[in-house]
Amino acid sequence: MQKVLGRIQAQVLRSRATNALANVVRHEATSSRTAAKPAATSKEFRERQVRFNIKNEQTEGRPLYLDAQATTPMDPRVLDAMLPYLTNFYGNPHSRTHAYGWETESAVEKAREQVATLIGADPKEIIFTSGATESNNIAVKGVARFYGTKKRHVITTQTEHKCVLDSCRALENEGFKVTYLPVLANGLIDLQQLEETITSETSLVSIMTVNNEIGVRQPVDEIGKLCRSRRVFFHTDAAQAVGKVPLDVNAMNIDLMSISGHKIYGPKGVGALYVRRRPRVRLEPIQSGGGQERGLRSGTVPAPLAVGLGAAAELSLREMDYDKKWVDFLSNRLLDRISSALPHVIRNGDAKATYNGCLNLSFAYVEGESLLMALKDVALSSGSACTSASLEPSYVLRAIGTDEDLAHSSIRFGIGRFTTVEEVDYTADKCIKHVERLREMSPLWEMVQEGIDLKTIQWSQH
């Protein structure tokens, strides 16, 4: 046991040094806006970062990681906060008769305050869950079912996360009416269309803050204002936005908000649901049990995970401006490097109303899966990790009007807190190299080079 704890302690110390070095690298790169000085330092940082894992095992040779929308690495400072509650402080936070329960309950309540502070809420409005998927299910199904005797209409969009869409389909099977609003070509909703869709039967509008595939940021403040004026509850899936962009549930008139721990450098298996108390939002719980979390989510709160989520929330609030500058710098660098070297590269989604850490590009005349296979030394994806097993083109890209060929050629680049200049440059250069190689093998690319408009060709069917 002592050897294990010794290895963990050594890893924590090593992680602290790594994180401090990363902060220095980010500061130098952001202030100078050049890669000259940070490039050498970031190489040293990367070597330190991937050399050991928590078990003190060597991990050299793993791919670079640019898939921050799927998940983020846990911040070492979050692990520091969690470790005592994985070892010494193991009491059940709901045990009110002894010190073991009291000390753990105190830690959970502190975490609740940290999450609430991040979004401008009251701690009593924070419900701990297993993640954003559960939070979305509770919010969408819970509100609809509670008010279902009088209101049977729910509004969402065609580009929501799959768990929201599937929750809405489940409600349709129960007899509810659901309107799936289309989005504009830039991925944003039409506010006038939303206003016209709300009726006296509408109980809930559920629209995500930042899209997990194309990074588009919806005007949640305007949506919230509209919903409040029409006395309709507004839920937003903010898993990709919390901790990355400023959010205030009161200023934005948000009634319910879903949060994920592992999207903000916290642990997996924990999330939160913000539920407004004034004006009060009523929910029907989707599971039965001991009535924990204000009776809305039964089950023992996992104290170590809750503590980790709280620590991640506090760090995100403290470093949000700093992280934004770093992510913007790297995202612009990646986009400029690729688009200046390759023609026919299309950015999917609005270029301004966006979170730059999620950059979705389509490379015309290249099959996206082929490009991903060629970039095997970089961890990337062609869309949501929750639907990555499907070979069908992204439903989000189809919803914004992207044709099937371009949808199949899309790659999502996820940039985060610990991404380095060297990683971005390496990825861009590899991407350019392989796109050029794959296009040389494409007869369609050859025809385009000869000036042939492919849209004018009548293709024969075989």
Curated annotation (Swiss-Prot):
InterPro entries associated with the record: Aminotrans_V_dom (IPR000192), Aminotrans_V_PyrdxlP_BS (IPR020578), Cys_deSase_IscS (IPR010240), Cysteine_dSase (IPR016454), PyrdxlP-dep_Trfase (IPR015424), PyrdxlP-dep_Trfase_major (IPR015421), PyrdxlP-dep_Trfase_small (IPR015422)
Protein EC: 2.8.1.7
Means of activity regulation: Active when in complex with bcn92/Isd11/Lyrm4. L-cysteine binding kinetics are reduced in the presence of bcn92/Isd11/Lyrm4 and IscU. Activity is regulated by other components of the mitochondrial core iron-sulfur cluster (ISC) complex; Activity is reduced in the presence of IscU but enhanced when both IscU and fh/frataxin are present.
Enzyme class: transferase
UniProt keyword S-adenosyl-L-methionine present: no
Main location: mitochondrion
Location in or out of the cell: Mitochondrion; Nucleus
Cofactor: pyridoxal 5'-phosphate
UniProt record, GO biological process: [2Fe-2S] cluster assembly; iron-sulfur cluster assembly; mitochondrial tRNA thio-modification
Active site: C386 (cysteine persulfide intermediate)
Catalyses which reaction(s): (sulfur carrier)-H + L-cysteine = (sulfur carrier)-SH + L-alanine
One cellular-component annotation, GO: mitochondrial matrix
Gene Ontology molecular function, alphabetical: cysteine desulfurase activity; iron-sulfur cluster binding; metal ion binding; pyridoxal phosphate binding; sulfur carrier activity
Modified residues (N6-(pyridoxal phosphate)lysine): K263
Pfam families from the UniProt entry: Aminotran_5
Residue numbers binding [2Fe-2S] cluster: C386
Tissue specificity field: Ubiquitous expression at high levels in any life stage.
Keywords associated with the record: Iron, Iron-sulfur, Metal-binding, Mitochondrion, Nucleus, Pyridoxal phosphate, Transferase, Transit peptide
Annotated binding of pyridoxal 5'-phosphate, by residue: A132, T133, N212, Q240, S260, G261, H262, T300
Record SUPFAM superfamilies: PLP-dependent transferases
Superkingdom of source: Eukaryota
Role this protein plays: Catalyzes the removal of elemental sulfur from cysteine to produce alanine. It supplies the inorganic sulfur for iron-sulfur (Fe-S) clusters.
Complex and partners: Component of the mitochondrial core iron-sulfur cluster (ISC) assembly complex at least composed of the cystein desulfurase Nfs1, the scaffold protein IscU, the accessory protein bcn92/Isd11/Lyrm4, and probably fh/frataxin. Interacts with bcn92/Isd11/Lyrm4 and IscU.
Family the UniProt entry places it in: Belongs to the class-V pyridoxal-phosphate-dependent aminotransferase family. NifS/IscS subfamily.
Protein name: Cysteine desulfurase, mitochondrial
